[in-house]
Amino acid sequence: WGEEKFRAALQERLNKPLVPAGVDLRSNEKSEHIGIYRQKQPLMNYVGLKVPVGRIHADKLQGIARLAEKYGNGEVRFSHSNSLIIPNIPDQKLGDLLEESLVKEFTYHPSSILRGLVSCVGIDYCHLATIETKARALQVASELEDKLPDTAPITMHWSGCPAGCGNHLVADIGLLGKKIKRGKEIVDAVDIYMGGRTGIDPKLAVKVMEDVPCDQLANVLEFVVPYHTREKMYPIKGKKYTRKWKQSSPGSAQKQVKLIENPILETKASHEELL
């Protein structure tokens, strides 16, 4: 029949018009609104500041409000990517704003890892969470910045429980918190998901590793991230590779990461054959 004939027949049966949903405004263009951007208004700008994992103390938030009053129109906005936005900054005030200490602390040009870092509130304030997320997310990000200073932009989202408030299923790397037994002790751990994205062609992330202890996570991600920057995410879509983390001797992260390395390379080769 085709879409138009089906729509006409359905409207006839329902005896009422079917209003179109409108224009799809989704796009694959990614913007966390972190940085310096021109506004539509002439000679006006907005500055997006990264607040690492969304945690900011009251005195510093008040300081941001004072900056908004001094350099803008007193307005501060918040984004889903854990950032603060100060809009309506005239050109002549922009340079002075960028020299403020708070702007240097909550920078508008974070590293490629910190830029895409998002975390749910974690066990500190949520009774559903199984692990602490915010401090761990910062710690892992800091270690990865040292290990991978030149990595391409990547999103890394932490969720402390299956409720998924950190949106781990739509990130390049999603981390889902859990507890595991290691020897005789119970420790914080994560399942690792990869390949999620939003936009015009959304995809849910694929779980590729299970039960990775948080205290060894940075060592694992050091070897995983290079395969999963945005340019290399798509080969693993649609396939599920689940591997249990196997504890072994210290310093063996390179051997352990091979649990997932071969499946990734295998699907990468298959993907390239289709091009």
Language-model segments: residues:
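Peripheral terminal and linker regions in Fe-S/redox and tRNA-modifying enzymes
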Residues: 1-275
